[in-house]
UniProtKB/Swiss-Prot annotation:
<dbReference type="GO" id="GO:0046872">
    <property type="term" value="F:metal ion binding"/>
</dbReference>
<feature type="glycosylation site" description="N-linked (GlcNAc...) asparagine; by host">
    <location>
        <position position="84"/>
    </location>
</feature>
<feature type="region of interest" description="Hypervariable stalk region">
    <location>
        <begin position="32"/>
        <end position="86"/>
    </location>
</feature>
<dbReference type="GO" id="GO:0005975">
    <property type="term" value="P:carbohydrate metabolic process"/>
</dbReference>
<feature type="region of interest" description="Head of neuraminidase">
    <location>
        <begin position="89"/>
        <end position="470"/>
    </location>
</feature>
<keyword id="KW-0378">Hydrolase</keyword>
<feature type="disulfide bond">
    <location>
        <begin position="231"/>
        <end position="236"/>
    </location>
</feature>
<keyword id="KW-0472">Membrane</keyword>
<feature type="active site" description="Proton donor/acceptor">
    <location>
        <position position="149"/>
    </location>
</feature>
<dbReference type="Pfam" id="PF00064">
    <property type="entry name" value="Neur"/>
</dbReference>
<keyword id="KW-0735">Signal-anchor</keyword>
<feature type="glycosylation site" description="N-linked (GlcNAc...) asparagine; by host">
    <location>
        <position position="54"/>
    </location>
</feature>
<feature type="glycosylation site" description="N-linked (GlcNAc...) asparagine; by host">
    <location>
        <position position="398"/>
    </location>
</feature>
<protein>
    <recommendedName>
        <fullName>Neuraminidase</fullName>
        <ecNumber>3.2.1.18</ecNumber>
    </recommendedName>
</protein>
<feature type="topological domain" description="Virion surface">
    <location>
        <begin position="36"/>
        <end position="470"/>
    </location>
</feature>
<feature type="disulfide bond">
    <location>
        <begin position="316"/>
        <end position="335"/>
    </location>
</feature>
<feature type="topological domain" description="Intravirion">
    <location>
        <begin position="1"/>
        <end position="14"/>
    </location>
</feature>
Amino acid sequence: MNPNQKIITIGSVSLGLVVLNILLHIVSITITVLVLPGNGNNGSCNETVIREYNETVRIEKIIQWHNTNVIEYIERPESDHFMNNTEPLCDAKGFAPFSKDNGIRIGSRGHVFVIREPFVSCSPTECRTFFLTQGSLLNDKHSNGTVKDRSPYRTLMSVEIGQSPNVYQARFEAVAWSATACHDGKKWMTIGVTGPDAKAVAVVHYGGIPTDVINSWAGDILRTQESSCTCIQGECYWVMTDGPANRQAQYRAFKAKQGKIIGQTEISFNGGHIEECSCYPNEGKVECVCRDNWTGTNRPVLVISSDLSYRVGYLCAGLPSDTPRGEDSQFTGSCTSPMGNQGYGVKGFGFRQGNDVWMGRTISRTSRSGFEILKVRNGWIQNSKEQIKRQVVVDNLNWSGYSGSFTLPVELTRRNCLVPCFWVEMIRGKPEEKTIWTSSSSIVMCGVDHEIADWSWHDGAILPFDIDKM
């Protein structure tokens, strides 16, 4: 065979193989398209797969076709009923750790927001940590000066409980330098206060959409709870203050349904001062333990009924729970009047347990350091000093801050009572430490049927950060 014949032969064989390959592909495609879908067993060619993710529940409809996945994101189905929340509080013998975010430790090298005023609130399916950001990250130049309470950069955001307030998992809720949030069983309601001191506005969001507003009525820093509002049978309640922080101000309780305000009442409290209430549902009413920033070192108590009638006074216990405060031995409690003659204060909480009361407070009498929770026999109704339980959460060598209450709904726990829980903010940076910023992390505790040993779940970040050394 001469060279020309060899070339022709090789070319013919190659062309034949190419034609055969094309025919095989045509047959394969024909069988796939026309035969397989009609055999009653689609396999993985066309199916819906439901996947649950830890951070939220997300339904994915995945259509698999010729090795190509088409993913369609479908909104999470809404609950079709409101939470009841008329059950009594569960009796708690102690408080066990629920979560700790370690946000400042992580933020030394991670993308974590500068925050203050964290709080927790729960839906029928999850608990979330809400917080007020400063529009800046830890260890960044924009964190300078974040000791300031009110600015146009502050926003309310949230993450699933236990997560750090990081940029990748945080969800925007509202523009706010003061806020509250709660879930009625169907959707989240958030309230964010923002704007100038003399004309601040509170914007109500329901399901992420603005639905109503409250304008400042006294023209002096309209503000709200900095902790969870309270929903009972579809109606949600919260408390707001407008007026001076160091003398008589004005106070109102509000009620909303599905994000629309359906009622409000003026709280008459001459000689008393109410700010930053920590509220929870108990036997169909809203019970709040608040902050007196004017004179009292005992805490105001506000009990709100469904018709917005109320009872207001002070926590009766013969032990003070605000900071700063005097010696326990020198304090005389009162159910009706501010006692202790100490200005300023810090957000705190208490839980009624029958006639007894669990009340949280800093361990230090003069600064926001350490944290303990005490159970006082008959402290809800009498000037009792009988301390029957004490649990340390943060030792007095470490900084604490605000604290507040929330409950675990029966939909989460499958119990016939509401589990009392609280969180403790641990403030780091200015004004106590040599940094250019102020931020915080938190520890969350929930009531259990056992006594829990003392320990210190403190913040633990090593300061200063790199940005503070520049």
